[in-house]
Amino acid sequence: MVTVRAPATSANLGSGFDVFGAALTRPADVVTVEKAAETTIEVTGVGAQYIPEDPKKNTVGAVVEALDAPARIHIDKGVRPASGLGSSAASAAGAAVALNRLYDRGLSRSELVPIAAEGEAVVSGVAHSDNVAPSILGGFTVTTSEGTHAVDASIPLVVCLPDVAVSTRDARRVVPETASMDDLVETVGNAATLAIGMCRSDPDLVGAGMSDPVVTPERARLITGYDEVRAAAFDAGATGVTVSGAGPAILAVCRDGQRRGVAAAMLDAFSDAGIDSRAYQTRIGRGSTVLEE
């Protein structure tokens, strides 16, 4: 038996659509696997009632097939589905790391990223790695057609999750198919600034580099109260605010000592909009961790 803790993640980070990702210290899924002749999946925890246990419809089932590793699998969900925090990716990442150890497949963490991404395709329709990469590798990740690169970073964050759902498929439908040259230049410059900030663990640079004039404004329209929550976070000292992944979670970058105030401001802003929400005071952290074997 192998048990793995797989962290929630935030993808895109504003200017890095389908490229950037970051592992969060909380929340997380816990995945336990045992060898079996036939694969079965049991899901408990947050939003378990919305997650199929049929291996053909669960992200974990695709990972099992790719590794040829049938198992009894238990997923204790700490990452709510349809949250913008890489819920399906956390399960797929945890299963990939756990099954690799259980069956002694000998694959590196980097080699597990595309395998876990196949699981993501079950949910979103596309095998993207921007969530599974940080959930497996940890830190800040950059994923392109050439592969994934990761760097350790220490950036304080607040994630505010409203009690509404935005599906990845719906969020992809609103993404513009074209962008102006001015918007392209602005986005590239911001993405480069963010990447430098991550390498330096500089929350001011990271926050300054999150602005995105193309994708984020369209996705923000799907989140009631987004503009007010964003403004409240900045007023409380956040250096950058954006939609986390497909949403509805909102990510705020903070300096040390400011997370509590930023979290309270974001919660109050959602409350003023008539929406319940939960705030996680977190930071960029480790990837999937083996807890027991």
UniProtKB/Swiss-Prot annotation:
Q: Which gene encodes it?
A: thrB
Q: Which reaction does it catalyse?
A: L-homoserine + ATP = O-phospho-L-homoserine + ADP + H(+)
Under which pathway is this protein filed? Amino-acid biosynthesis; L-threonine biosynthesis; L-threonine from L-aspartate: step 4/5
**UniProt cross-references to Gene3D superfamilies, sorted A to Z:** 3.30.230.10, GHMP kinase, C-terminal domain
**Where does this polypeptide localize?**
Cytoplasm
Highest taxon of source:
Archaea
**What main location does UniProt list?**
cytoplasm
Annotated Gene Ontology cellular component terms = cytoplasm
Instruction: Return the similarity comment.
Output: Belongs to the GHMP kinase family. Homoserine kinase subfamily.
The positions annotated for binding ATP are R80, P81, A82, S83, G84, L85, G86, S87, S88, A89, A90
UniProt-listed Enzyme Commission number(s): 2.7.1.39
Q: What are the BP-aspect GO terms?
A: threonine biosynthetic process
Q: What is this protein called?
A: Homoserine kinase
Gene Ontology molecular function: ATP binding; homoserine kinase activity
PANTHER family (alphabetical): HOMOSERINE KINASE (PTHR20861:SF1), HOMOSERINE/4-DIPHOSPHOCYTIDYL-2-C-METHYL-D-ERYTHRITOL KINASE (PTHR20861)
Q: Which UniProt keywords apply?
A: Amino-acid biosynthesis, ATP-binding, Cytoplasm, Kinase, Nucleotide-binding, Threonine biosynthesis, Transferase
Q: What biological function has been recorded for the protein in this entry?
A: Catalyzes the ATP-dependent phosphorylation of L-homoserine to L-homoserine phosphate.
